Amino acid sequence: MDRQDYVIEVSHVSKSFKDNKVLKDVSLLCESGKIYGLVGHNGSGKTVLFKSICGFLSCDEGTISVNGKVMGKDKDMLNEAGIIIEEPGFLRTWSGYHNLEFLYTLRNKKNKKHLYSVLEEVGLDPRLKRPVGKYSLGMRQRLAIAQAIMEDPGILILDEPMNGLDKNGVKEIRELLLKMKEENKLIILASHNREDIDVLCDEVYEMEGGVLRRL
């Protein structure tokens, strides 16, 4: 495969916080229509790598390119990405639907009826009036996934997407992610649950001490 066919290219990236080097010469190539899994202990550098790919952190060394454009030179290029890295700051007194509607409107999107199908796709009732502050952890996680997919992104960056979900919820979200893969989406996910990784992922990488290696 030619390098221009890769959607995300991480090339020799290093990142330090003071004297702590958390990413060490990391390289990764990702293409559409695949799910990439990232495993590793807490503090191994997974979240820092995700934040760097999403443009939330700059690299000390190396480059990250998305669709051929180098991160840092084009701030808008990840608008097509759906991201779960930390729990979104939903307005706790609003319903799930109204939270999504507010974000959708901010992004100048018009077809709000589309949000009903998005919520149903992640297993939430769009007519539910309950404020997000009274949602269970699993319901909040479903809402976070709905936010990530509501604009039909070509790229999904998901840190522990199954967190807080019960057995049925895990099954539903796995099926959703596999469906999105079939739609030629690129998905990168981190999980401590090896079963999620084994069921979903085409390629698996381990982060240990800031070093990335393929398993």
Task: Show which residues each predicted segment covers.
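H-loop/switch region of ABC-family ATPase nucleotide-binding domains
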Residues: 191-192
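The feature captures the beta-strand-to-loop junction immediately N-terminal to the Walker
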Residues: 39-41
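Helix-to-loop junction immediately C-terminal to a conserved catalytic motif
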Residues: 54
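Conserved ABC transporter NBD signature motif
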Residues: 62-77
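Conserved ABC ATPase "signature" region
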Residues: 101, 112-127
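Catalytic Walker B motif of ABC-type/P-loop ATPase nucleotide-binding domains
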Residues: 156-160
